[in-house]
Design a protein with these regions (language model features):
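Beta1/beta-strand and adjacent pyrophosphate-binding region of the FAD-binding site
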Residues: 9-23
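C-terminal helical "tail/cap" subdomain of flavin- and related membrane-associated enzymes
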Residues: 331-438
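FAD/FMN-dependent oxidoreductases across multiple families
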Residues: 77, 245-329, 335, 341-345
Length: 438
């Protein structure tokens, strides 16, 4: 009987695609595959609406919303975001990049979102397109076999163990990195060992007029702050610093966060009359990646595959983009098995390209040479427009943008070399440090 049951299970798995996680990556993938007629089960460990950080979106999210049919609903519940403000105490000024100045003029704005609301919109959209959705159930393991379906095990909120079988598994488990951890392919990213702490505030002072919804990136001595205005009147504020900075804090997290805010005059001024809502949250070991994003019967999407840094608000965009590319790959694997290997290679290449395009800037954002370039924008050969296009999420652009980004990189290296040469020739005193790097 057991052998008969196993044969029946292999012939008739519970679903074509099992999606682990119901955040932006998982819900996007599930919606697209269900729309194409696949039997999809999506399981989320929490229950929507639930809190999540990563509230700032990019203009290139807009065509993805259009494709999913959710743009109007997102717009009704969100704060318009027209650009990015960089604030540098080392230069004594602020610089704003408006998305309308990008090479592609079709998407001149984006949104700041409450992730509890936004993620629920995506989750319900997947269900509306035909995916079977389950909440409050944590997936604990996935077993693969060469000649049969994958076997998935989870535990629901009542402690009951549940099992499913599927022809294909999409790991969208976020920072839990279910498959990357299980398969031993998760690696910390040594180039960006950051951590973050953040909270939400009422009555924070915002920018005036149309710029009210812009994200502010504020540098300070130990890293940088984000300042994200939300449509309900609250503002998300977070500090991203080297992990070592948090280890010697010597006090509780809330008091430490207040002291770090006080050390940044720009943020302290904006929060002078503000009131914190809820507790301070910390997230460590920010950057990591999986050495492979796919296998014979699985793919990883979103944070389950990699996470770099939130400085350019790429998290949700990359998650949804991986969802689109991932859904295409999975659809090919299921409908045209002979082309599965090529489809997965294409997915791997697209994932690496999107991550590498953004990461080059992220790895260098704290370097004086990069700060100098961002704080002194010049549109030589339309390079500023190309950088704006990248900041808007245009990571799969053609040669028109890529060629200008290569020129920007060349100028960065020249600027960095000049800065290092200056330091070697004329060492500065500590009291002159701010002047030297400005």
């Amino acid at each position: 009987l057991a052998q008969l049951d196993q044969r029946v299970t292999q012939s008739h798995p519970d679903c074509d695609v099992f999606v682990v996680g119901g955040g932006p990556a998982g819900a996007t993938t599930a919606a697209l595959l269900a729309e194409r007629g696949h039997r999809v089960i999506m399981v989320e460990k929490d229950r929507h609406p639930r809190f999540h950080i990563g509230e700032s979106l990019l203009p290139m999210n807009l065509p993805l919303f259009d494709r999913l049919g959710i743009r109007a609903e997102v717009e009704r519940t969100s704060m318009p975001k027209h650009g990015i403000e960089f604030v540098s105490p080392y230069h004594g000024k602020t610089v704003t990049y408006n998305f309308a100045g990008a090479l592609d003029k079709r998407f001149p704005y984006s949104f700041q979102v409450r992730r509890s609301t936004f993620d629920e919109i995506l989750f319900k959209n997947a269900a509306a397109k035909g995916a079977a959705v389950i909440e409050d159930c944590r997936i604990t393991s996935v077993e693969f076999s060469e000649d049969g379906p994958a076997r998935i095990t989870g535990r629901d909120g009542d402690g009951e163990i549940r099992h499913w079988t599927a022809n294909f598994v999409v790991d969208a488990s976020g920072r839990d990195t279910l498959l990357a951890a299980q398969l031993g392919v998760k690696e910390r990213n040594p180039r960006n060992n950051s951590a973050a702490m953040y909270g939400h505030f009422a009555n924070a002072r915002r920018l005036p007029g149309k710029a009210e919804g812009n994200i502010s990136v504020v540098w300070f001595d130990h890293g940088w702050f984000w300042f994200i205005p939300l449509s309900d009147g609250t503002t998300s504020v977070g500090a991203v610093c080297p992990a070592s900075f948090f280890k010697n804090r010597g006090t509780d997290l809330g008091s430490f966060f207040k002291s770090v805010i006080a050390s940044c005059p720009e943020i302290a001024s904006r929060l002078k009359d503000a009131e914190m809502i809820g507790d301070v949250t910390a997230t460590g070991n920010y950057s990591y990646g999986a050495t492979t994003a796919s296998g014979g019967k699985f793919i990883m999407v979103g944070d389950a595959c990699a996470f770099i840094d939130p400085v350019f608000s790429t998290g949700v965009f990359l998650a949804m983009t991986m969802g689109f590319h991932g859904a295409e790959a999975v659809d090919t694997c299921l409908r045209k098995p002979a082309q599965a290997r090529r489809a997965l290679k294409t997915y791997e290449a697209a994932t690496k390209k999107s991550l590498s395009s953004i990461s080059w800037f992220i790895y260098r954002i704290r370097e004086p040479a990069m700060r100098n370039l961002f704080m002194s924008p010049r549109n030589w050969f339309r390079m500023e427009e190309a950088v704006l296009s990248l900041l808007a999420g245009d990571v799969f652009s053609g040669w028109q943008i890529r060629s200008r980004l290569y020129m920007f990189r060349a100028i960065f290296y020249a600027t960095k070399f000049a800065h290092l040469r200056h330091r070697l020739k004329a060492p500065v005193k500590v009291s002159q440090a701010a002047e030297a790097i400005s």
